[in-house]
Regions:
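Acidic glycine-/aspartate-rich tracts in secreted/extracellular proteins
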Residues: 64-69, 122-126
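Short, exposed beta-strand-loop hairpins at the edges of beta-sheets
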Residues: 119-133
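Short, low-complexity cationic-aromatic patches
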Residues: 43-58, 102-115
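Bacterial N-terminal signal peptides that target proteins for export
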Residues: 13-24
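Short, Lys/Arg-enriched N-terminal segments with co-localized hydrophobic residues
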Residues: 1-13
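A low-complexity, Ser/Thr/Gly/Pro-enriched, surface-exposed linker/loop concept
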Residues: 72-99, 136-141
Length: 143
């Protein structure tokens, strides 16, 4: 009887090992796919006619008074009403030249090459660039 039970245990172990041999690669592929999708997040803006635009197609700008790579924006209050920030979601993860700064109110804003990005409230439609050079402090966001 001992030989028969050892044989049965060995046969059971081989079945489990065989199942693991096929399941392990599938689990690994699934895990790598999940990691890749987290790391390969879509950029928050695209390029149109040489400048960055938001998902709504509206032109994005940088503010000369923002200190590059400071991690914050100096355009708050009435400034942010006229120059709405390109907001980042709570789960957005920056990569490459994209970063996220924390605003005075605790909200998150996208930045490119360390400069926070903004829309101009007076741009009426996609493609407008009326904020470029405003007060000699606002610039088109370029790649």
């Amino acid at each position: 009887m001992r030989v028969a039970s050892l044989f049965a245990a060995l046969e059971n172990a081989m079945k489990k090992l065989s199942l693991f041999r096929f399941a392990a690669p599938l689990l690994l592929v699934g895990a790598l796919t999940a990691c890749g999708s987290m790391m390969m997040q879509k950029a928050p803006a695209t390029v149109a006619d040489g400048v960055y635009v938001g998902a709504n197609g509206m032109t994005l700008y940088t503010f000369d008074r923002d200190t590059m790579s400071s991690g914050k924006s100096v355009c708050n209050g009435p400034c942010a009403t006229n120059w709405p920030p390109l907001m980042a979601g709570a789960t957005d993860n920056p990569s490459g030249e994209w970063s996220i700064v924390t605003r005075d109110d605790g909200s998150r804003q996208w930045a490119f090459r360390g400069k926070p990005l903004y829309y101009w409230a007076k741009d009426a439609r996609a493609g407008d660039r009326t904020g470029d050079g405003f007060n000699n402090a606002w610039r088109l966001a370029r790649p």
